[in-house]
Amino acid sequence: MELRQLKYFVKTAETLNFSEAARALFVTQSTLSQQIRQLEQEMDTLLFERDSHSVQLTESGERLLPLAKRTLMDAVTCMDTVNDLKKMLSGSLNIGITYTFAPILTETVIAFTKAHPAVKLNIFYKTMEELMSMLEKRELDFVLSFKPSSVHPAIESHVLFDNNLSVIVNRYHPLAEKEKITLQDILPHGIAMPAKGLQSRNEFDKLYPSAYNQMKVRMELNEVNVLLDIVRGSSLITILSEAVIHQTNGLVAIPFDVPDNIMVGCVHTERGAYRKKAAEEFIRMLQESEAVRERAYNGLNK
């Protein structure tokens, strides 16, 4: 049995399509089929039920799939460990980040790639739940986001800074002079709302579970930078974390005046998992970055 065969098996099991799996693996379909057949012969069992219309896993295939995934992940961990023992910062680093955290990441990405050019960064922007699922499957080395409201026992969170859910307006907006804001304050104003699934929207729905139908929602978007551009150039307001506009010209953040309005910026890792030296170095640089230090300072001095 070879790791390559397990890799081919896993991709075919995920797609249930030999042609699609072969394309994803950059091999010919005949090569893929040959390796799968060889694996079945070595294990003396069929892993797939094939006919002219479909491909399905057999019971043996279903049993093998999670074990094969774990074996492939462990093989990657072995390589990372050996490289770390040689004190090499190389290989790849898979980072998950929610859309709201984008402004916080940029400074560290630039500094890290200059300091460690042998490390390839793979950065995935997705919703919180998608990222937590990828982290639990060990498809990511760590995730940057606010602390989720749901419980993930397999994941541990390391605090970077505290923040508040805020109303974001342009600096000429009638609300821009306020130090705190209430739900009643925003009801007369048109709103560009973050879409469901974004952490700011999740936090707002938690703080004000019945408010949405009272509000003048003109649009919903799942792209934070576009939301900010719309607010900067119009009379619309939006609702995001205060951290999003730190050192951004033309916009003002007014925190909601409501109990429990705390959004905790975190690095999330798999509990008990081996952490690459490259990941440790990236997180160290992130913690020391101006973007994080200033947010942490502002949180302590509110």
For the regions a protein language model found, what residue spans apply to each?
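Flexible hinge/capping segments at coil-to-helix
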Residues: 87, 154-165, 169-191, 275-276
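Alpha-helical linker/hinge and terminal dimerization helices associated
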Residues: 42-43, 64-86
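Short helix-boundary/capping micro-motifs
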Residues: 10-28
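N-terminal winged-helix
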Residues: 29-30, 34, 80, 86-116, ...
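Short beta-strand-centered segments that line the small-molecule binding cleft or hinge
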Residues: 85, 107-111, 129-165, 169, ...
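A short LG(V/I)-centered, amphipathic sequence patch enriched
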Residues: 40-59
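Secondary-structure junction motif
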Residues: 189-211, 275-283, 289-300
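Beta-alpha-beta core module
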Residues: 152-158, 163, 225-272
